[in-house]
Every structure is written in structure tokens, then in C-alpha cells.
Amino acid sequence: MDIPPAIAAIAPDGRLTPAQRRRILIDLCRRRIRPGTGSGSGFSQRRTALNPWPDLRPVLRGIPWAIVGAVATRAYMPERATKDLDILIRREDGDEVRERLEAAGYRYVSRLAVPGFLAQSPEGVEVDVVLGDYPWLEEALTRLRQDPAGYPVLALPYLVLMKMESSRGRDLGDLTTMLGLASEEELAQVREVVARYAPEEAEDLESLIYLGQVEMEKVPLAEDRTDAEG
């Protein structure tokens, strides 16, 4: 496949950094977004735990850990389908976590592309164990939230940091939805954490908040404001 001109202008070889991917997707959204999600407001506010996932709380008791990735988003937006469970632990706990999982019947499958490993539950569920060394990790592991099933998940500011660093298409979709649904108090917490740990991402964060609020019809598009004023 030929590299599209808009991509080639930024990265002639087509190899975009996460920040470049994020900026392109934000620009696309700015041009194409329209208010409304296609779902009723009641659905947008619904928080469920309909998809069953392995309960690792008894297995990892005493070890700090949190659910991240797609499953974690159900604490902040409507639940969406995903094929695996991602958890985040401290790098130094990796060996003990693997030993405990294997003792509980989990099977080690392979290493991940990032530091960590893939395990499979006795029921065949894939669990990605991410070994974290983020500068904010210790802080985040003391400020966990609970999802609708009572499982520990990263608080919104740290989940935002992880998804901004990854910046895949589905991550940007999750970000605009979660930020669009967040309260002003939650957004203040996100801004504060991003300002401390990733100040270079502050401009993109504001764009994602704006896009999310337009999607949730919390703010009108600039063109709509102009029409109303005219």
C-alpha cells in the first residue's frame, strides 16, 4: 500500500511516532466530528461489568496491581468488547506475579512487545501482564478506583497518560469518550497529573477534552456558535 500524502509529509517512511499518530487523528476528528454519540444519554452514563473476567484479587493479594487497557475503561464509559484483560504491576513484582499465576493454574504463553508477559487462565482467557516503570506508577497504585465489578482499575488521570502514550486509533476513541463524560472535577485532576508527568501533552489533552465534549454535546462546535450568533 502506498503511503498517503498526508502521512508521507510527516514521516516519509510511514513510521509515525505515537505523538504523530495522535496529532493526525486529532486533526481528522476536528475536521469531521459532529455532536452526538448515536446513543441516548442514559446509555452514555451507564457503567456495567457484563463481560466476565478472571478475578485476580485473591491470586495477587498483597501485590499492588491494577486493570488497565480496554477493560479499565468501563469504570469511566460504557463497557466495550475486548478479547483480553490487561493488568499493570511494578516491574520488580514480575517474577512473583508469574509464580502466583502459575500456582493458580495460569499458563505462561509468551513475552509481550512491551515489558511483560502473556498468560492464559484455566478457562482460556488471555491476560496481558504489563511490567511498569512509569514515573507515576507508585502514585497511581495508591489511588486506584474500582470498576462496576469491584476490580481495581487505574484512576482516570493515569489511564489517560497510558492511552496518550500508546495513541492507537482505539486509544484516541477511548480518550475522547472518557474525557467527554468526565466531570469538571475529574478533568481538573487529569490536567494536574498530565501537567506534572507529561506537560508536553497538555495541548493535545485540551483538544481531546474539547472533542469529547462536542461528541457528548456538552459544548457546541465553533461553526454552530457562529450560526447562532449570526
What is each of the regions a protein language model found here?
Residues 1-230:
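Compositionally biased terminal segments of proteins
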